[in-house]
């Protein structure tokens, strides 16, 4: 049996939501609309996303509705109880997460801090949400003098530990993070990722090094990626995908520096011969602009992505399918710095398909994973539906 598509390239525009989800009120996110609010006042068009049909999913500034879209289009709502990156990605690959990860807008509880201190023999300082560069500027010199651990968080369910490489050697920092990872698997903490954040330099001139290391949780069940790998298909993770799934179901992992490097890496992968999926996360939308409520930077990043689409399309093969989607929202005009509970856009196109139309909406991101699993004839997730039939493609 031949598969409809030999290769599927899945691109997650991290946090690029397309309007408040049906249960947004339960998350205090009424009125959120990342794409609309980001593009309001933006002076440039997004011709390639427009041509694919992004503006057909919902009315958007600078992205018009088109009569003949270049992709199948719809929007999906999230079933899982959470609006973080890991929950969104895990659901995309077929899981339904009913126990949300915890976030710590007021810092970590005293009980956890005490456990970390007694386990490591080092004092914890900072203990609040902050940007990594800001917290190192503030506490870096103190850390060098005392050997304390700079512990901080963000709007995501993460615990980050920063230390100067000359004060706490990398091996020790990694060992500390591994211990904290085990500690925080306890349901009362349930933190998604522990991140080692080493830095170097002198007071007033500290820089974070590339020796960052993430300690994630394994997904709470088998994903479509596991099924693909077990069936001999390639699963090429680009960007932070490998970290999000803790390596589960991944056959090759490629690191990226930023969105544009992510697109460069994807295009290089597309040029190779393989059978299976490539899976790219473009994190800058979320990390650099959404959390920082930088509307202008966010809009420009979407424009930069739009400009790369023709290059990607030029390298596609006849039996390739491209899927462009998101994992949650992060409305740059929303209060605070947290993600927003939103629909995600879904655009799917292939050189072998000439006529496109709207697809039915679904109430789970898992329909992306189900469609991929159906294409490769591997085990289907319990949640979601395959869009292959609606797309007019089937197994031969």
Swiss-Prot record:
Record keywords: Cytoplasm, Isomerase, Manganese, Metal-binding
One GO process term, biological-process aspect: nucleotide metabolic process
Domain of life: Bacteria
Single annotated GO MF: phosphopentomutase activity
Residues bound to Mn(2+) 2: 286, 291, 339
Pathway annotation: Carbohydrate degradation; 2-deoxy-D-ribose 1-phosphate degradation; D-glyceraldehyde 3-phosphate and acetaldehyde from 2-deoxy-alpha-D-ribose 1-phosphate: step 1/2
Pfam assignment, any one: Metalloenzyme
Cofactor binding description: Binds 2 manganese ions.
UniProt cofactor(s): Mn(2+)
Gene Ontology CC entries for this record: cytosol
Catalytic reactions on record: 2-deoxy-alpha-D-ribose 1-phosphate = 2-deoxy-D-ribose 5-phosphate; alpha-D-ribose 1-phosphate = D-ribose 5-phosphate
Enzyme Commission identifier(s): 5.4.2.7
Entry binding sites for Mn(2+) 1: 14, 327-328
Matches recorded under Gene3D superfamilies: Alkaline Phosphatase, subunit A, Phosphopentomutase
Cell location: Cytoplasm
Family statement drawn from the similarity comment of this UniProt entry: Belongs to the phosphopentomutase family.
Purpose: Isomerase that catalyzes the conversion of deoxy-ribose 1-phosphate (dRib-1-P) and ribose 1-phosphate (Rib-1-P) to deoxy-ribose 5-phosphate (dRib-5-P) and ribose 5-phosphate (Rib-5-P), respectively.
Protein name, UniProt field: Phosphopentomutase
Protein species of origin: Staphylococcus epidermidis (strain ATCC 12228 / FDA PCI 1200)
């Amino acid at each position: 049996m031949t598969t409809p598509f030999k290769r599927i390239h899945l691109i997650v525009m991290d946090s690029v939501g397309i309007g408040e989800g049906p249960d947004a009120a339960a998350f205090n996110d009424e009125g959120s609309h990342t794409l609309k609010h980001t593009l309001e006042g933006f002076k440039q068009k997004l011709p390639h996303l427009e041509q694919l049909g992004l503006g057909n999913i919902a009315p958007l500034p600078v992205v018009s509705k088109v009569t003949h879209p270049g992709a199948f289009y719809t929007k999906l709502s999230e079933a899982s109880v959470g609006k973080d990156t890991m929950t969104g990605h895990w659901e995309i690959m077929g899981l339904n997460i009913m126990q949300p990860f915890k976030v710590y807008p007021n810092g970590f509880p005293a009980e956890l801090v005490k456990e970390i201190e007694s386990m490591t023999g080092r004092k914890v300082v900072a203990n609040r949400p902050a940007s990594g560069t800001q917290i190192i500027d503030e506490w870096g010199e103190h850390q060098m003098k005392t050997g304390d651990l700079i512990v901080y968080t963000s709007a995501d369910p993460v615990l980050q530990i920063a230390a100067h490489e000359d004060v706490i050697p990398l091996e020790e920092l990694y060992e500390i993070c591994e211990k904290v990872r085990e500690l925080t698997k306890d349901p009362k903490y349930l933190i998604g990722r522990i991140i080692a954040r080493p830095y170097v330099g002198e007071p007033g001139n500290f820089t974070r090094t590339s020796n960052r290391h993430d300690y994630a949780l394994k997904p709470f069940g088998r994903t479509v990626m596991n099924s693909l790998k077990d069936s001999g298909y390639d699963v090429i993770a680009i960007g932070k995908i490998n970290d999000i799934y803790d390596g589960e179901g991944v056959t090759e992992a490629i690191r990226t520096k930023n969105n544009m490097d992510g697109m460069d890496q994807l295009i290089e992968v597309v040029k190779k011969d393989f059978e299976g999926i490539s899976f790219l996360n473009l994190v800058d939308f979320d990390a650099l602009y959404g959390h920082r409520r930088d509307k202008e930077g966010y809009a420009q990043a979407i424009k930069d992505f739009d400009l790369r689409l023709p290059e990607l399309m030029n390298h596609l093969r006849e039996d390739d399918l491209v899927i462009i989607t998101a994992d949650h929202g992060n409305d740059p005009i929303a209060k605070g710095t947290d993600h927003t509970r939103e629909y995600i856009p879904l655009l799917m196109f292939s050189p072998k398909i000439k006529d496109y139309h709207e697809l039915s909406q679904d109430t789970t991101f898992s329909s992306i994973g189900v469609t991929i699993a159906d294409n490769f004839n591997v085990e289907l997730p319990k949640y979601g539906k395959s869009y292959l039939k609606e797309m007019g493609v089937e197994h031969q």
